[in-house]
Amino acid sequence: MERQLEAYCAHLRNERQVSGHTLLAYRRDLEKVIEFCNNQGIAGWDALQVQQLRQLVARQHHHGQSSRSLARLLSAVRGLYRYLNREGLCQHDPANGLAPPKGERRLPKTLDTDRALQLLDGGVDDDFIARRDQAILELFYSSGLRLSELAGLDLEHLDLTGGLVQVLGKGGKSRVLPVGRKACEALQEWFRLRGIAAPRDGAVFITRQGNRLSTRAIQMRVKTFGERELGQHLHPHMLRHSFASHLLESSQDLRAVQEMLGHADISTTQIYTHLDFQHLAAVYDSAHPRAKRSKGNES
């Protein structure tokens, strides 16, 4: 089983050209299946049956594995069996028709508008790191980029005169997004100092040494800003969630938010309507005369 897993991973890496992160996640999931098979005395991939795979999924769920993680595990198994069937090494797929247990969908964490403005209006020193980090925060909140999209930006992708940025999203799909005035100003200030360090390098966000800033480094800079300005944990996706939530709250245009986020399915975007409803419910509870309860009626 291990040998066939190695062959499949090589196929994903060399022919499918999946990202290193995805490859590592799939390998870990499939190694769990191999461990389960070894413990159950299942001799190979061709011997694994749907009842046994269902047992593994149930066991993982019982031990706290999320529905999302189990869906990824089943996706990894299906991908492996497609490969094995194509190579003539197997003739079935035990994951076919098998779904993970349904779990509660967690609402994304966001900053409210006041906290977002507190983060961005905290004041900026006129130096390389401060100007770069401010531009990163402004662009995340202005345009709702994913971490990988922002890290992969090149200078040619930005049109500050027109207030536009072109990003390459999931599945290699390109989209053009508006960039707000404050973000454009922050980027212009950053470019004033950036050009001194790497005038010929194409990456938008770079280190002092002129190298492209990694996704990990961007995560750490955002975390540092959150702790310093807000006293809380902050990550890039929280800024993306805040962008989506605040835009939907103001515009009520779900389709437009879907396009800007680069979601293939509008159901993914609809989770932000639940956040908007939470906000409306809080306003109602605090403001509507028939929603307020007197202290004497709280029993």
From Swiss-Prot:
Positions annotated as active site in the UniProt record: 146, 170, 237, 240, 263, 272 (o-(3'-phospho-dna)-tyrosine intermediate)
A GO MF term: DNA binding
Gene3D superfamilies according to UniProt: 1.10.150.130, Intergrase catalytic core
Keyword Transcription: no
CDD domains cross-referenced by the UniProt entry: INT_XerDC_C
One Pfam family from the record: Phage_int_SAM_1
InterPro entries xref list: CB, DNA_brk_join_enz, Integrase-like_cat_sf, Integrase_catalytic, Integrase_recombinase_N, Integrase_SAM-like_N, Recomb_XerC, Tyrosine_recombinase_XerC/XerD
The Tyr recombinase domain, residue ranges: 106-285
BP terms from Gene Ontology: cell division; chromosome segregation; DNA transposition
GO CC field: cytoplasm
Family from the record: Belongs to the 'phage' integrase family. XerC subfamily.
Subunit organization: Forms a cyclic heterotetrameric complex composed of two molecules of XerC and two molecules of XerD.
This protein's name: Tyrosine recombinase XerC
Gene: xerC
